[in-house]
Amino acid sequence: MAKKGTRVVVTLECTECRTVPPSEKRSPGVSRYTTEKNRRNTTERLELKKFCPQLNKMTIHKEIK
């Protein structure tokens, strides 16, 4: 039987997509990425700088529940 690992799949969401009006976006919606994180090493929420296709620029993506 397999052990339960320390790695969990998390979703990262763009922080700027919610505040920018739809007229300034390339397409409607919110940018989201999925990734894995090690629960033992990073107990706090992830915050990475990723490319947002809706805004066509690099933005901060934060972990959501």
From Swiss-Prot:
Database matches in InterPro entries: Ribosomal_bL33 (IPR001705), Ribosomal_bL33_CS (IPR018264), Ribosomal_bL33_sf (IPR038584), Ribosomal_zn-bd (IPR011332)
PROSITE patterns documented for this protein: RIBOSOMAL_L33 (PS00582)
UniProt entry keywords in alphabetical sequence: Ribonucleoprotein, Ribosomal protein
One example GO MF annotation: structural constituent of ribosome
GO cellular component, one term: ribonucleoprotein complex
Annotated segments matching region Disordered: 20-40
GO biological process: translation
Family under the similarity heading: Belongs to the bacterial ribosomal protein bL33 family.
Protein name: Large ribosomal subunit protein bL33
